[in-house]
């Protein structure tokens, strides 16, 4: 790999610094272990393990700063995917200017990968097409999830990879290789496509007495339905919303146009196209961005608000319920005379974590009640 630092136009310039990013680190790896691993490559200025600002737990990546760029380049070319604590790490040039990464230029997406293809194999498969800034197979506790990202230093290299690799069979699986798209772009494509073809209708603000049959009676006059379902909690009580799937797009569109805003038993219905998860996440992201722009400075935490909490839920239990979604700086149940008031707040370190928590936990039964979870307005203190 060359020693030039790429820019979005695909041109190279000398790296001004000799720093490497080290990813996929075992949680027990320390700065001293990094130093001992990379010192044979050349004199070092320092090593650093990045940690959560609140919990101080390691984030799984760090940096190695060499004195000389040539030594950093040698380490990058010869030590990538070596082991520390029995786990292979990923190396790439540290990029203080993140405009290239945020632009998406040169970034490609690969899916339908065989589980045997790891980061090392991915790197060597695609390095023939140009200089790779980073590559990563997305994994969970069970291993590869079957998709990955490769970021080249130029659009030309990315296009070469797409041209040569899209549709190729790797380990008897035909892979898809295409341009990386940000969630907002993918959501816009889904909206455009689904608005012209949707058959699934989302209905909310329906009365407790509305069951599947009554909902079907209300919607069947617009066309034949494939399924009608009122969503209920574990006790069988209606959650106030449901779905109607029609056989044709025309019937679904007519129902939306005619029934949206109509009053049924004193309740004004919301009737619209059922959105896919990617669209809901994109909408939450747009809403957050609008709120964030109103703030004078970027907040240190992203809050979500939880209503309808069971009386048995305290601060510790609230944090436990949401901890799987990311790093929590604060979890608080509002109290009155020693008893919970039925609502609380949880603050995450990033918007992505908060959004995931809202999407997964809204409507989930905790204790004996379904939670109502919403994204809060970012504040200076969370």
Swiss-Prot record:
Its main location: cytoplasm. GO terms for cellular component: cytoplasmic stress granule; cytosol; mitochondrial matrix; nucleus; ribonucleoprotein complex. InterPro entries: Nucleotide-bd_a/b_plait_sf, PABP_1234, PABP_RRM1, RBD_domain_sf, RRM2_I_PABPs, RRM_dom, RRM_dom_euk. It holds the Pfam family RRM_1. The keyword Repeat applies. It is found in: Cytoplasm. Keywords: Cytoplasm, Mitochondrion, Repeat, RNA-binding. Residues 18-96, 106-182, 199-276, 302-378 form the RRM domain. Expressed in fetal brain and in a range of adult tissues. The keyword Hydrolase does not apply. GO terms for molecular function: mRNA 3'-UTR binding; poly(A) binding; poly(U) RNA binding. Binds the poly(A) tail of mRNA. May be involved in cytoplasmic regulatory processes of mRNA metabolism. Can probably bind to cytoplasmic RNA sequences other than poly(A) in vivo. This is Polyadenylate-binding protein 5. The gene is PABPC5.
């Amino acid at each position: 790999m060359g020693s030039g630092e790429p820019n979005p136009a695909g041109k190279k310039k000398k790296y001004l610094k000799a720093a490497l990013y080290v990813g996929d680190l075992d949680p027990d790896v320390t700065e001293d272990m990094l130093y001992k691993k990379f010192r044979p490559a050349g004199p070092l200025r320092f090593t650093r393990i990045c940690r959560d600002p609140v919990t101080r737990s390691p984030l799984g990546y760090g940096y190695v700063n060499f004195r000389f760029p040539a030594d950093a380049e040698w380490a990058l070319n010869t030590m990538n995917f070596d082991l520390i604590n029995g786990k292979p790490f990923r190396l790439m040039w540290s990029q203080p200017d993140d405009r290239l990464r945020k632009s998406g230029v040169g970034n490609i997406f690969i899916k339908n990968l065989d589980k045997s293809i790891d980061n090392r194999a991915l790197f060597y498969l695609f390095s023939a097409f140009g200089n790779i800034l980073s590559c990563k197979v997305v994994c969970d506790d069970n291993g590869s999830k079957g998709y990955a990202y490769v970021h080249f230093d130029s659009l030309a290299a990315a296009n070469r990879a797409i041209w040569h690799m899209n549709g190729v069979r790797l380990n008897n699986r035909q892979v898809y290789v295409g341009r990386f798209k940000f969630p907002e772009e993918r959501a816009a494509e889904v909206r455009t496509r689904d608005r012209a073809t949707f058959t699934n209708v989302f209905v909310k603000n329906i009365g407790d007495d509305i069951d599947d049959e009554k909902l079907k009676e209300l919607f069947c006059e617009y066309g034949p339905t494939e399924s009608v379902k009122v969503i209920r909690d574990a006790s069988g009580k209606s959650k106030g919303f449901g779905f109607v799937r029609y056989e044709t797009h025309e019937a679904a569109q007519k129902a939306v146009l005619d029934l949206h805003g109509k009053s049924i038993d004193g309740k004004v219905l919301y009737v619209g196209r059922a959105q896919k998860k990617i669209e809901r996440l994109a909408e939450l992201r747009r809403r957050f961005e609008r709120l964030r722009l109103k703030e004078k400075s970027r907040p240190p935490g992203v809050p979500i608000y939880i209503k309808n909490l069971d009386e048995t839920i305290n601060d510790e239990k609230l944090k436990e319920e949401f901890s799987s979604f990311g790093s929590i700086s604060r979890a608080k149940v509002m109290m009155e005379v020693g008893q919970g008031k039925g609502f609380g707040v949880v603050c995450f370190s990033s918007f992505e974590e908060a959004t995931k928590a809202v999407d997964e936990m809204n409507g989930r039964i905790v204790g004996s009640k379904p939670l109502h979870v919403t994204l809060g307005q970012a504040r200076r203190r969370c």
